[in-house]
Each structure stands twice: as structure tokens, then as C-alpha cells.
């Protein structure tokens, strides 16, 4: 069924038009224009089975538990997700980066008794397991690094020798990582196209990969992909100072996870990043 026909079924009126939007590397994304002038965003398929329902649940969770600006969920089913349209561009002035730091620092003050989440979530197209766990370092080792490493091996994206190196590294993670004072709610996928700004203000955070973990995983991810630069980190540390050693050591440990996610998605040069990181720590 054509998208406009499907939307007519949902709304009881036919939209005036739909336009493809960028950012649909996993599924299709469309801007929908309704007869009354309202604009909506429709997302189609592309994620893991039930993935759009998981995305809807994550956005609703953020809306109900935080002040993070996220699009309202208008309609959700397995193959169709309709969201509020929030204007903005993935271009950030220094003031907008500082505003992003304020938002994320506030998000990271939201805590839970344990690490994980009420359900598994998503990172890109893949399920992200979140069994409730008492201890951060074993959770990060098993549910992030080893889980994704095994997915990469099964997909023939990661040599078996790399997984053995990763397993040996995970046995010694407590040499480099620190447990947080409390599990913090993290967005989990802060790269540039998942954040929108209007002028000097952040207008939306999109496509979360939620769980309660260590806030440093969020900051490491931002540094890896260059989502934000010095104005962001300066303002974040004014609000929530980081213990020594994050930029020197822990950042690279945490970034093994997004590197492995990208190996699973794309292979290629991301495997070199995994190799360099493991070698840096002697594995």
C-alpha cells in the first residue's frame, strides 16, 4: 500500500503531500504535510522486528521521565511510526553545543537502582540487551562489548582472533573503568543527525538507544564521532565535572562499543579502529 493511502487510513483524511527526508540510513523517513497545515514525520520499517514500536516506547519514556526535547509519538505500529515534526538542522553554534551539554547533563542526573532498562532497546538496526544488573563493568563487558563482538563474528564481519582479544580485554576492564555513583539514563546514540538545533537552542534529540549506564559512554560517543566539540565539553564539565582519566583512557575503552556496532553495520575501516584500541591496551 502506498504511504499516503496508509496515512489516510490512520488519520481519516488524506495528507496533501509527502517528501523524503535525509537520515533514513536504516529505514525510510518522510515529511508529511496535512490539509490543515500540520507537518508530521513518518518512519517506515528498516529496524529490527518490532523496532519502530521500541523506538516509540523510548521516545515516550524520555517524554515522561526527562525534560529532553523529543518528538511526540502520534501513532506507532510494527511498520509505521508517526512523530511530531520538530524543525531544526544538525548544525551547531558554540551556544547550541553548550545548550546540548545542559540538556544531556540534566538527562544524566536521572538515575535507577541498577544498570539496564525495563526492556531491550535498539542501537541502529540491532537489538540492545538491557538485563537489570548490579555492577556496571560486568554489564558493559557482557551486554555491550561481548554481545556486539559476537554479533559481528556471526555476521562474518569480525575475525575470530579479534573476538578472542576482546574477551581477554573484557576480563581486565576493571583496570581502566570506574563504576559511577549511580546508573545514569543515557540517550545512547548522540551523533549529529540525531540532534537538531534552531539558532543557539537544541530543538530535538532523535533516535535514542536508551538504558541506564555510565554517563561517560555518552560523552565518549560524542567525542568519537565529533558530534560536538570543545564548547560542549567545557559546559558539560562546568555542570558535571569528569573524574581524571576520561579523555586519556576511558573514552577509548567506551568507544569500542560504537566501533563494534559500526563494524556490524558497515565493516571496513571500523575494524581498524577496534584493532587499534585493543592494541593500545595490550591485546
Task: Describe the predicted segments one by one.
Residues 84, 257-264:
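Conserved PLP-binding active-site segment of the aspartate aminotransferase-like
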Residues 52, 97-100, 162, 166, ...:
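Hydrophobic packing residues in well-ordered alpha-helices of helical domains and bundles
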Residues 19-138, 283:
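ATP-binding pocket architecture of kinase catalytic cores
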Residues 262-283:
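ATP/Mg2+ or Mg2+-diphosphate-binding catalytic cores
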Residues 129, 134-141, 150, 183-185, ...:
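Active-site Asp-x-Gly
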Residues 1-10, 112-185, 198, 238, ...:
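An alpha-helical support segment within catalytic cores of ATP-dependent transferases
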Residues 12-19:
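Conserved N-terminal boundary motif of the eukaryotic protein kinase catalytic domain
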Amino acid at each position: 500500500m502506498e504511504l499516503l493511502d496508509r496515512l489516510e487510513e490512520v488519520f481519516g483524511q488524506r495528507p496533501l503531500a509527502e517528501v523524503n527526508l535525509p537520515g533514513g540510513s536504516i529505514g525510510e523517513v518522510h515529511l508529511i504535510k496535512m490539509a490543515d497545515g500540520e507537518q508530521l514525520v513518518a518512519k517506515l520499517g528498516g529496524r529490527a522486528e518490532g523496532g519502530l514500536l521500541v523506538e516509540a516506547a523510548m521516545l515516550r519514556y524520555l517524554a515522561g521521565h526527562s525534560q529532553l526535547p523529543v518528538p511526540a509519538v502520534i501513532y506507532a505500529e510494527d511498520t509505521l511510526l508517526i512523530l511530531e515534526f520538530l524543525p531544526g538542522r544538525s548544525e551547531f553554534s558554540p551556544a547550541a553545543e553548550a545548550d546540548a551539554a545542559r540538556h544531556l547533563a540534566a538527562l544524566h542526573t536521572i538515575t535507577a537502582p541498577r544498570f539496564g532498562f525495563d526492556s531491550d532497546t535498539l542501537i541502529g538496526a540491532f537489538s540492545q540487551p538491557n538485563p537489570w544488573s548490579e555492577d556496571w563493568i560486568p554489564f558493559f563487558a557482557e551486554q555491550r562489548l561481548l554481545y556486539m563482538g559476537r554479533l559481528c563474528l556471526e555476521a562474518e564481519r569480525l575475525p575470530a582472533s579479534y573476538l578472542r582479544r576482546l574477551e581477554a580485554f573484557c576480563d581486565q576492564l576493571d583496570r581502566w573503568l570506574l563504576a559511577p555513583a549511580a546508573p545514569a539514563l543515557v540517550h545512547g546514540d548522540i551523533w549529529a543527525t540525531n540532534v537538531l538545533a534552531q539558532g543557539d537552542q537544541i530543538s530535538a534529540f532523535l533516535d535514542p538507544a536508551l538504558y541506564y549506564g555510565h554517563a561517560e559512554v555518552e560523552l565518549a560517543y560524542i567525542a568519537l564521532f565529533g558530534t560536538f566539540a570543545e564548547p560542549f565539553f567545557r559546559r558539560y564539565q562546568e555542570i558535571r565535572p569528569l573524574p581524571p582519566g576520561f579523555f586519556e583512557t576511558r573514552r577509548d575503552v567506551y568507544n569500542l562499543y560504537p566501533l563494534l556496532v559500526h563494524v556490524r553495520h558497515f565493516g571496513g575501516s571500523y575494524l581498524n579502529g577496534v584493532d587499534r584500541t585493543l592494541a593500545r591496551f595490550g591485546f
